[in-house]
Amino acid sequence: MADMSVKQLADLVRTTPERLLEQLKEAGVAITHVDQTISDEEKRKLLLHLKTSHSTETDKKRSKIVLKRKKLSVVKSGKKSVNVEIRSKRTYTKPVVEQKRETEPAPTQEVPLTSDTTNLNEKAEVNVATLEKAVEAEVKEEAKKTPSEKKETPKKGPRKETRRSRKPDKEDKWEREELHMTKLVEERRRRHKPAHMPDSDNASAKLEQGFARPTAPVVREVALPESITVADLAQKMSVKAAEVIKAMMKLGAMVTINQRIDQETAAIVVEEMGHKPKLIKEDVLEENLVATLGEQTGEAVPRAPVVTIMGHVDHGKTSLLDYIRRTKVTSTEAGGITQHIGAYHVETELGMITFLDTPGHEAFTAMRARGAKCTDIVVLVVAADDGIMPQTVEAIQHARAAKVPVVVAVNKIDKPEADPERIKTELSTHDVLPEEWGGDTMFQPISAKTGEGIDALLERILLQAEVLELKAVDNGPARGMVVESRLDRGRGPVATVLVTSGELHLGDILLVGREYGRVRAMIGDDGRPCESAGPSMPVEVLGLSGTPVAGEEAIVVPDERKAREIARFRQGKYREVRLAKKQTAHLERIFDRMGEGKQNTLNIVLKADVQGSLEALTEALNKLSTDEVKVNIIASGVGGITESDVNLAIASDAVVIGFNVRADAPTRVLVEREGVDLRYYSIIYDLIDEVKKALSGLLAPEFEEKIVGLAEVRDVFRSSKIGAIAGCMVVEGVVRRHLPIRVLRDNVVIYEGLLESLRRYKEDVAEVRQGTECGIGVKNYNDVKVGDQIEVYEKTQVHRTIA
């Protein structure tokens, strides 16, 4: 601060110059005139003097505090009134503190302001409690009659003691009530403290609890179940639900706050918002089940190999198995092709083998993949006269994916056009090399018709099984896999189960995916009932709650209640995931709906005999959809056609298709009465061809233009009635009346219209051939000039089909 005069300093501190000069003199500063300049050092000296003098005076004054209280109150009892005066006096002395030297800086220490107040309140309460003992009993009775007055005047003055006031029970009761009211009053005073007087006790706490803005974005690890609502997801990320909805709109999905989304979508949203997703599988019940069952304890014994026969359609897979079983399995299949997975247990002279016969048609891809999943060895059947086909290559891929060895059976070698060497060469292009060429694949030429080479093929299969050392525990709870399932009328759900380990008995509680039930009956592959089934044995199981999905694992559970809980848990989880994936408000679907007005749809109600065929048909029919026509399977199921299926078809204008199933008598009556299109099929080729024809009929018509004639304008005649008439020479083809035309000028189309009039020698004619003159009148067009060309064409409709 710059030096200033004494007068200026006096004006600054708001005092008189004379008073300031006196204080400077007391402080020992040599300044005698108001115009003299005072330095910073002299100011500090003056300030130190003032502090010392003021602190000494206040210490003397404030070292002792005397509090005096005087309260007047009137207590009424009937007609009498008593004046009560309460006087209290308290003296508080400040403790002596040693003064430190002036050279040392005095530490600043906060003294809580509420400590003295608290002591005062406590002492005042004690004083009031002692004074209450002198109040008369008449006052107590009046206070009982008027409790509201008691609340207003809770503290009573001292009175002369009477007999009634000496009673201990009433005295204690009055003392407790008044003491309680005193505390309430004190608490109310504290609670309603003015806003400009902050509580010193909480001052430091409020400073410490202030909100600190984060310096960096907070990255959280968000646990995501298999399905979650948008609101729960927002809560886990500590953001508003509107932010999550906005992020999903940027990703192309429109959702609501209560809509469920699947785990994959939630993980994408969490990553988009800068957090880390943690995927959680809600399979605690299943893990507990596996833990209770544990590993099967028992000695593993050799088991029969499970062999899957794969190959292209009509290459002789079922005929080969037919020869081995000595039965005509092929004759029972419609059209001579396999449309189910057949599981057969065969006892040969060399040992036992379980065969799985898979379909070869392209629609049964899922069945072949399922067959390769639960097999030990794959026998690839290739026709020697046909060679490698698409399903042959697909079977090789399934075998490699399942990591199972392949044995190639070259069939139909009894035909004169058979060429086994060509088969080896073609398979070598797919990395299937025979042993004689340095590979690891066994090749065996066979004939399913004559039986040639089949014994050698069985030897190779069992040799491969010995190399694999196939073993399984043959006792304890059974485990297996569902090969096929269907809904049988009269028997209910039927599942073909291939036992992989343990032993399955009648009465066991079987858990299969989302279905469960007690095994009511077991039927072997020969059609005979059996009571137990060991490893590598296929059996048909009756008694499940529904038709399980083919490919599900079957496991025996000791407790039916636990099986029911797990099945219901899986059903609920499946439903939640399915609903979460069904995004009805997805942006892409909105755009699809905008174009659906131009797309024709064929609605189908599909019923099949087994689950595998239903899957294959659904996939094959959905592949037929194009940009113009669409197959919409509104309902599908396993079992016969019922009235509910027909009613659904009536409501949705659909075609009912039954594959190897029929409708009962009441349903047929309903079909005839309502005129529903009901079709039966037993061969998948016929079904797909018929649906293709139906879709072809829904295609928009396509027209092809064909130029039939060309005329050149030589002259133009104008008439007030007719308009412009072009005198033309037909230079090419034939000109016919009422056909569409184009007017060309310098080879540029300037008008398209209709040929309205055609004359020759003032007579109307139907057509004019090449080299003939004629007059042509064009409808609603009069700007014809010499040198123009009139092109006459016709439109023909082209029959369109689905490729």
Swiss-Prot record:
Region feature G1, mapped onto this chain: 311-318
PROSITE patterns: G_TR_2 (PS51722), IF2 (PS01176)
Region described as G3: 357-360
Region (G5): 447-449
Stretches for region G4: 411-414
Keywords per UniProt: Cytoplasm, GTP-binding, Initiation factor, Nucleotide-binding, Protein biosynthesis
Residue ranges of domain tr-type G in the record: 302-471
Keyword Zinc-finger: no
Protein's name according to its UniProt entry: Translation initiation factor IF-2
Organism: Coxiella burnetii (strain Dugway 5J108-111)
Source organism phylogeny: Bacteria, Pseudomonadati, Pseudomonadota, Gammaproteobacteria, Legionellales
